[in-house]
Every structure is written in C-alpha cells, then in structure tokens.
Amino acid sequence: MFSTHHVSRLLIPLLFFFLFCCFSSTFAQDDITNPVEVRALRVIKESLNDPVHRLRNWKHGDPCNSNWTGVVCFNSTLDDGYLHVSELQLFSMNLSGNLSPELGRLSRLTILSFMWNKITGSIPKEIGNIKSLELLLLNGNLLNGNLPEELGFLPNLDRIQIDENRISGPLPKSFANLNKTKHFHMNNNSISGQIPPELGSLPSIVHILLDNNNLSGYLPPELSNMPRLLILQLDNNHFDGTTIPQSYGNMSKLLKMSLRNCSLQGPVPDLSSIPNLGYLDLSQNQLNGSIPAGKLSDSITTIDLSNNSLTGTIPTNFSGLPRLQKLSLANNALSGSIPSRIWQERELNSTESIIVDLRNNGFSNISGRSDLRPNVTVWLQGNPLCSDGNLLRLCGPITEEDINQGSTNSNTTICSDCPPPYEFSPEPLRRCFCAAPLLVGYRLKSPGFSDFVPYRSEFEQYITSGLSLNLYQLRLDSFQWQKGPRLRMYLKFFPVFGSNANNSFIFNRSEVRRIRGMFTGWNIRDEDLFGPYELMNFTLLDVYRDVFPSASPSGLSNGAVAGIVLGSVAAAVTLTAIIALIIMRKRMRGYSAVARRKRSSKASLKIEGVKSFTYAELALATDNFNSSTQIGQGGYGKVYKGTLGSGTVVAIKRAQEGSLQGEKEFLTEIELLSRLHHRNLVSLLGFCDEEGEQMLVYEYMENGTLRDNISVKLKEPLDFAMRLRIALGSAKGILYLHTEANPPIFHRDIKASNILLDSRFTAKVADFGLSRLAPVPDMEGISPQHVSTVVKGTPGYLDPEYFLTHQLTDKSDVYSLGVVLLELFTGMQPITHGKNIVREINIAYESGSILSTVDKRMSSVPDECLEKFATLALRCCREETDARPSMAEVVRELEIIWELMPESHVAKTADLSETMTHPSSSSNSSIMKHHYTSMDVSGSDLVSGVAPSVAPR
C-alpha cells in the first residue's frame, strides 16, 4: 500500500514535469490572432446578450486557435505576421443586444452574419470600414434606425441582406456605388422615400427585393437599365398615383416582376418583349384599360392582375401558355366570353395543375367546352354566367384543397424503428439503414412559380448537385407557402452508407463543415426558377456535437495542447494506479457537484399551478417511453399515455427535434399555459425541461378525439343532443381563448382531432399555445387583429380568406369550428374522395335538401333544431370574413338550440355520458340544460368553474 507520504513524493516531481511541458509548449505555440481583432471580438461579445451561452468559449484562449464559436480565420498569417478573422457567423443563436461599432476593426472580414437573432439598435456605420466584406447578413432581427451611408462604400460587397428588421428612413444614394453587389434584399422593413434613380446604373444587380416597406414617389424608369436584373419585387409599398414605366418592358433578362399593392395607376405595360418572364403579379392596384394583346413568354407560370379596374375582354394570348399554373383576373370589370382554351389547351401531367380565378367580373358565357379535368380549377363566382344552373360547380366558394399549400412525406417502412436520433435513410441500396441526418431550414425568398409540386424533383436535383451529394441523400420532409409568397422547406441530408470509416451512420466532421459552409457562404449557385434562397437554420443532432468543438477552459492553442500531449507520454508510463484512483475520485466529486448544481437549478424552477417533473419520473410513467404507450403523434412530437407514481393517468407530449425551443421561450409558454383554466380546455398539469428534453404533461382524455367518436361506429353512436353539447363546449373553450386569455390567443388549427372528450364526454379544446398568440403590430405594419405567418391549419378546416390575404384572425377559428359543426351534423370528414364538406352542404342547403345530409346514425331530432344547427355551421363557413358570426354569437346560438331541444333528448344525453364511461354523480335534464347554457356569454358561465388567474384584456 502507498502511504500519503509516498503519494506526495510521486506527485511533486510529476507536477513539475507537467509544468515544464506546459511552459515549453507555450513558447512553441501556433501563430496568434491580430490583437486588435481579439480586443474587438471581446467588446462585440460584451454588447450582446447570450441567454443560452453559445459564446461561452469566447472567454479564453485565442480566437483563431481555440475554436471560438462562429469565428473563422484565414489559414495562414498575413503580411503583418498575425492570423485574421475572415468570417463571423453568429446566425440563429438567440442573441440579443446591440451590434458594436468594434465590428469595423475586423478589417479582413469577408462574411458578417447575425441572421435570425433578436439584435436591436442601429447598424453601426463602422461596418463601412470593412472593405473586404462580401456578405453582409443581418436579416431576421429587430434592428432599427436609418441605413448608414457608409454601407455604400463597400467595394467587394456581393450580397446585402437586411430584410425582416425595423429599418426606417431612405435608401442612401451611396448605394449606387455598389458595383459588385448582386443581391439587394431590404424587404420587410419600414424604409421610406423615393427609390434612388441612381440605382439603375448598378451593373451587377440580379435581385431587388424591396417589398413590404413604406417607399413612395415614382417608379424610376432607370431601373430598366440594369443589364442583369432577374427579379424586381416591390410589393406593398405606396407609389401613390404613379404608373408603371413602359421601359420596364425592355428588361430583357427579367424573370419575375411583382408590384402587388403599390397604389399604381394607368395601363398594364406591354411585357411581351421580355423573352423569359416567368412570374407577373400586378394585383391590388388601380390599373385600368385593357390587357395588352401581346403574347407573353412561354416560360410564364403565374399571371395575377386581380383587384384592379381592368376592362375589355380576356386576350387570346392567354391560351396555349405551356407552363401556366395560375391566372387570376378576379375583381375587375372584364366582360365578354371566357375562352376555355386557357385550360383546355394546357397539357398537364399527373403532378401539374392550373388555377383560373375569374371571380367578380362581368363575363356572360364560356366559349368552348366547360368541362374540367381533375387537376384544373376554375372559379367564376360573381359573374352573370353563374345564373346558368349548369355552371354551379364553377360558381361555388373557394376551398383550400384546390390550392397546393404544403406537403409532408409519409416515409412509411416495414422496418423496425431506428433508435433516436437516427432515422431511416432514403438510400435505395441499403434497406432499413439508420443514419443521423443534418436538419436544414431553407426558404425560397422569391420563387418563380405558384405550384411547387411540378418542380419538386427539379429542386431536389438542383440542391443536391449544388452540394455535390447524391440525389437519394436528400429528403424534402415538408414545404409550406408563407406570406410574400415565400416557400419554406424542411430538408434532411443523410450520409452515404460506408462513407465514414469510423461510423457509417453519420457524416464525418469535414463533410458536415463542407455542407454547412456551402449554405452559410451562399456557395450554391443561383437557379433562375427558384430565385434567391435563405438559410433559416442548420441543426446538428447530438451525435454531431464534436464537429465544432469548444475551446478548452485552459485557453491553450492547438500547438500548446499538442506539446502537452507529447510531453505527457513519458509521464503516462510512470503513472501509478493509486494516482489514477485519486484523479478519478476527484473527478467524481466534481461531477457530483455539477449534478447537484443542476438538480438545484431545476428544483428552484417554480411555475404556479403546474408541476416540474424530472425526466426519470416521466420515463417511469411511460415504461421508458415504450412504443406501446404511444397514443398519438402531431407536429410537436409523440404523445404518450403515462401513469404517475400517484396513480394519476396523464398524456405526455414529448417534443421532437425541430420543436425544441430555447429554455426561456419554453418556460414562457409554460407560464402562459399554466394561467389558462376553463372546463372546455385541456389542462396542463406539468412539464419537464432537462436531459435535453422538453415535455408537456396534460390531463388524460379517456374518450379520445371527437374525430374518433364520429367516424368509429360505437355500440351507441353519439346522438344529436350529445353532439350539440360537444359543439357548445368547444365553442366556449375557443371563446375563452379569444376573450379571456391575456394576451388573447387565436387557435389556428381547430379540427375534430383537436377536440378531446373526457370520461363524461365533456369537450375540451387541445393544441393551443404561444405560437398562436394574437399579435401586436409587427415589422410589416400588420394590424393587431390578425396573424400573418406560416399557415398552421389543416386542409379542409383552413379559412379560405387566408389564400387571398395570408392573414388569420379570430374569424378563422370561427370558420374551422363551422367545419367541425358540419362534421357533427353529417358524420362526414372535411374532404372525402375530392369532395369538400362545405361545398357539398352549401349545395344541399341551396337546393332545399339540407336534412338529407344528416348523419343517419342519429336518432330523430326536431327539424327546427337541425336546421338552425346547419344554418349556423354554414354561416361560420362563409367565404367572406365579415359575414361570419363572432365566437360569442356562435355560443349564444348554440345555447338557443340547446334550449329548444326536447327534455327527453337532454335526459338521454345525460344517461349516455354515464353509461359510456365510468360511473359518476347523476344529474337531471334540467340541471344539464342549466349547466350548458348562459345567455350572457361574457358573464359567469364562460368562466364558471374557472380559476380567475387570467385577467381580461
């Protein structure tokens, strides 16, 4: 046995040996970063708030030698003998604070990226000192103030992206000096004043995106002098009374012209001389006169001239356009015949479709055949020809299933599940090959089409060839149209089997860095059809945690570390077991201290009204999240049925990769949900935020979803009184979200599968949260009465006005609930075999046969109640938002119908809720009626049984 004295005698010389190695390696360390840039980086960090500690390794060591997060350096020293920072990539790190003027001291910088953070304040003029800068990427922040004149003196700038901020003031005339700039993205700000005519002299510009600003004055004819301009996008500005210059018809390279809602007047210019024009949107202006007769390019996919004051007839040149996807001439004063050749002569394959929107004009007839193929949609509502009963199918309201708004891969397989975070690779030669993908959020900022499906295969080839990957390494998980229109995508890239000698299931480090660098450096070539893209996020799963290693706490450079390793080889030979044991015991004590601190931190987290569960508690409740306990899956993640130690049965929502939030955002959402209490909302019982997991614990609903209870043939199907009770409860829950939650919440995804039923068949609305808050005015100047965002709805339930306005309101929830009411009335699904429930029931109502659509499984009910119920449902589903009732009116009318129900039906409903579930206390029918009605919906009944913890707004 070694005594303490013997151990000390061994440790002392060993300590001196290690110190010698450290000092020796320090003198032999690598080249260091320019001291001016080191000081600048430290000041830059001090000006930022870093709540998730992404920049924690900026405290130690040398930026270039110690792998500082987001810092990329040149590979060798420059003429001053120092290393220099070449890129500062701090995108999507949840940073806030201000941009420091010290950025101007990074004199050799080529890429400056703070995209998708929460940076406030103004843009430092000192950035204009970085003459080497090629990419200035500040989009997706909260920056304000004017654009500095100094930015116009960056001679090497290729791309300037300051979109989606709060920038105001004019465009500096100095921008006319940006002779190398190709991409000019300033959209979604509050930039005002005249577009400088001097910009027309820029020789390299290919994309001008200035939409959603406050620009005014006139449209400079000089813009037509740009020799390489491909995209001109100026939507939603205020060029009061100005006309579109005829010279814009001479933009020979132009692919897309979008001047929607710009207060433009005068005639539509003749654009027939633009050989490759693919997208034209001049809608929502005050253009007048007739549509030019010149034939547009065969490349055209979209023509939108709706909401103007155009007169005359549809020109014959709109027929025979081989790539046309959308023609919208709605809300004009056009007349005459509609040439059916527009859609009859369009050759369509199985992936292609065409939409022709001619609503609200003066068309009197259709020339040619009026029959439609399955992938052709024609809207004629509001024209004189709709008086012809044979055209009723073309004159109904718009429904969203006619428009391609998104897609998700099914990814079905006969293989057993991959262990998280691995997924089945799409590699064709290796079935059931599990691999860890790279997750990329990607957005096309100005696509040249209206329907993505026909171009999906072409896009997949474009992106994989640009990244030098095989086509099968990409899975386009889903895509969604956003306001703009812009196209958001969720991409997954998989490694090739056997490509990584150490681990076939993941990309090697160099490949991850290469792919990431291609995206962050905008090194994927532009494709005319897809337009400019932007990187929304690049997510690395935990298995890739070593790809971008953090600096060691010691702050030693790579050379120093190498010296220590080499010098320590000899020491390792003499290291005894007792010393190893001592070191291990010290480490164990250190780990225990860290674990205690973590437990203490979590234990101190208290949110009133909900419990903070440990990961172990929820794993135990679900048999370690056994697949046998899974009861559902949604956009947030998988849902498990669990039994807590107390015996309480709960539903546990476990966030999947892509749904995880920052800790602050997650806890903010928990705090909001904990304050929502109503008997018709699913109650949040607790949460878990540890072990890299985020989970929500809800009360368990024994009778599942309303969708299940309508579609499944129960021994005793739900009768009308029970369905009416469910409808009333659902409406009250939604009304609470609209009027009593603080801030108010628009649900945005009301559907039968989001209405759950407890043991007594009480309806409880589920799946609401922070992502659905009624908004305050944002950077686009949108009013606080609606949400403008990625559509969250479900086909069949989504407000049709969304496809015109890209806005969701409280009336959008009314529309969705109306669809649910129609489901309750008919037993049908929203969309079945291409038939839309709203359209079908409207047709039946107009023909006087509404009662023929009643679900035959229900017992007889007074016709008066059924007709009032159906009429209310159809009012909720009116195409025009203003024509729909408010949610408060819906509740009142449902209560009136409930009062009209015979006592025998109400009593039977009470009995049904008893016999179909666990025994509970009885109540007579009069009590049942009183319990579910209250003519003053703003009073006690709305919040009866509700803890008054949310103050009215």
From Swiss-Prot:
Protein kinase domain sequence ranges: 625-897
GO-annotated cellular components: plasma membrane
Per-repeat ranges for LRR: 85-106, 107-130, 132-155, 156-177, 180-203, 204-226, 228-251, 253-275, 276-298, 299-322, 323-345, 352-373, 374-395, 845-868
Binding residues annotated for ATP, in chain numbering: 631-639, 653
Protein location: Membrane
EC number(s) recorded for this UniProt protein: 2.7.11.1
Keyword Electron transport: no
Record-linked SMART domains: S_TKc
Main location: membrane
Leader sequence residues: 1-28
Residues annotated as glycosylated: 67, 75, 94, 179, 188, 214, 250, 261, 288, 307, 317, 349, 365, 375, 411, 502, 508, 537
Cytoplasmic side: 585-953
Protein name: Probable LRR receptor-like serine/threonine-protein kinase At1g06840
Gene source species: Arabidopsis thaliana (Mouse-ear cress)
Species lineage: Eukaryota, Viridiplantae, Streptophyta, Embryophyta, Tracheophyta
